[in-house]
Amino acid sequence: MFAWLFAPSTAQACELVLTEHRTGRPLVRLALNPAQPAADVAFTHSVLGTPVLDRYVWRLDPQGWRAHLVEERFEGEGYGLPSAAGPGERLLRDGPGWRLQLDRLVDPFVILPLPAQSMRLVLADQRVVLLGQLSQKSIEIRAENCSPPK
């Protein structure tokens, strides 16, 4: 059903690896840009019903490739949405909504794909993965085999 999502199985390909968080059950491997591993998580705010987009980049450090939340785009004001920028962050008006620029380490990067939120992983090449179709349980997302920065 999702054959077009799977990257060819090569040992050194830069990939996002999605597994069930508690069991480790493999769900999918997705090819990434090895020089700039990044992906967006798009979803519908559970209370407001408005779109939210979280942008993540993976950076190499001594503990491996780890996700950093670098931007959040949203409309409206509601539970879980920022109302002000924290230290080192910038909250900017962006059309009808807002854009929060930040650099927050998210490790481990785990998402529970609630059906009402229609959580989607969006890759740079515009591939979209509906997370709730992969599993109803918490999903861990990690980058593997990407090129070290030069």
Label each residue range with its predicted role:
Residues 1-7:
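Bacterial N-terminal signal peptides
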Residues 8-14, 113-118:
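A short, compositionally biased
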Residues 11-76:
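N-terminal secretory signal peptides
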Residues 64-69, 77-150:
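Mature, soluble, non-transmembrane domains
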